[in-house]
From Swiss-Prot:
It comes from Saccharophagus degradans (strain 2-40 / ATCC 43961 / DSM 17024). Coiled coil: none annotated. This is Ribosomal RNA small subunit methyltransferase H. GO terms for biological process: rRNA base methylation. InterPro entries: RsmH (IPR002903), SAM-dep_MeTrfase_MraW_recog (IPR023397), SAM-dependent_MTases_sf (IPR029063). The gene is rsmH. One of its GO terms (molecular function) is rRNA (cytosine-N4-)-methyltransferase activity. S-adenosyl-L-methionine binds at G34, G35, H36, D54, F80, D104, Q111. Specifically methylates the N4 position of cytidine in position 1402 (C1402) of 16S rRNA. Its EC number is 2.1.1.199. HAMAP family: 16SrRNA_methyltr_H. Belongs to the methyltransferase superfamily. RsmH family.
Length: 312
């Protein structure tokens, strides 16, 4: 299986924002093919430690090879949503917390470009879409069994697809004739049901995004990480998030705002000072890829990086 090269987005900017203590303990919550992790290790001293996390067994295999190269690195097969409960990190939590956490929420080029993974409408393959190919329901299994109203809800909520109901109806009508098994097949049905294409965007883009997010519980996982982030960071520790679509970025932006300003509550509610506490300081402005990076990697065009620092 030939993989496309994966360019880590905002690599220099994210690592420089993350590594504030070369002797600290860090987490790369989306290891992928190790681009960010290798850059982090290059900035760490001999006492520094880095833990990589990934759902994808293929990414974990790459991480195992990096473990053999560098004793400061360990790979964990799982989700960053479980960060707080990872056994290997409990000693660091007990000792005061992590020096930094980085997550790059984008789908990697190998996942998108390898047809067998089923993420892309550009390459025909099995309609799978699972980040963790060893567990959970495939996209085909869900699409072929879900209620029409549930499909419409997913397309609307996770893809912001305005023709969600029309598409869901077309999907259900077609699966009654023949179940979906291939990405191109699904893309063609969605494409035909898209009444008005967005300029410069494939008509199946939003539907594929929506199903992928739903199958992999991407927003639920992100919400859990945001909820746990302050408690796992040491004072002065950095939280770096790179998001790729508005659903993710809105969640991250709102979280950083609430944690930096102190959460706002309606008047009259019984609110404690702890509930209104400022937990994060926002570092710099939201950052996007520059012209040079865009030339090298067009997929970085929608990336937005936000950085927060844990207050004591």
């Amino acid at each position: 299986m030939n993989e496309s090269p994966h360019f880590s987005v905002l690599l220099q900017e994210s690592v420089e924002s993350l590594v504030v203590d070369p002797a600290g303990t860090y987490v790369d919550g989306t290891f992928g093919r190790g681009g960010h992790s290798r850059a982090i290790l290059a900035k760490l001293g001999p006492e520094g430690k880095l833990f990589g996390i990934d759902k994808d067994p293929e990414a974990v295999a790459v991480g195992k090879a990096l473990e053999a190269e560098d004793s400061r690195f360990r790979i964990v097969h799982g989700s960053f949503a479980d960060l707080k409960h990872i056994d290997l990190l409990q000693a660091d939590f007990a000792a005061g917390g992590l020096s930094g956490v980085l997550v790059d929420l984008g789908v990697s080029s190998p996942q998108l470009d390898v047809a067998e993974r089923g993420f892309s409408f550009m390459n025909d393959g099995p309609l799978d879409m699972r980040m963790n190919t060893e567990a959970g329901m495939t996209a085909a299994e869900w699409i072929n069994t879900a209620k029409q109203e549930d499909i419409a809800q997913v397309l609307w909520e996770y893809g912001e697809e305005r023709f969600s109901r029309h598409m869901a109806k077309a999907i259900v009508e077609r699966r009654e004739i023949k179940p979906f098994t291939r990405t191109h097949d699904f893309a063609e049905v969605v494409k035909a049901a898209n009444r008005k294409w967005e300029k410069g965007k494939h008509p199946a883009t939003r539907a594929f995004q929506a199903v992928r997010i739903f199958i992999n519980r991407e927003l639920e996982d992100l919400r859990q990480l945001l909820d746990d982030s302050v408690s796992v960071l040491a004072p002065g520790g950095r939280f770096v998030v790179i998001s790729f679509h508005s659903l993710e970025d809105r969640m991250v932006k709102r979280f950083f705002r609430d944690q930096s300003m102190g959460k706002q509550f309606p008047k009259g509610l019984p609110v404690t000072e702890e509930m209104k506490k400022q937990n994060l300081k926002i570092i710099g402005k939201a950052l996007k890829a520059g012209d040079t990076e865009l030339t090298q990697n067009i997929r970085s065009r929608s990336a937005v990086m936000r950085v927060g620092e844990r207050l004591g």
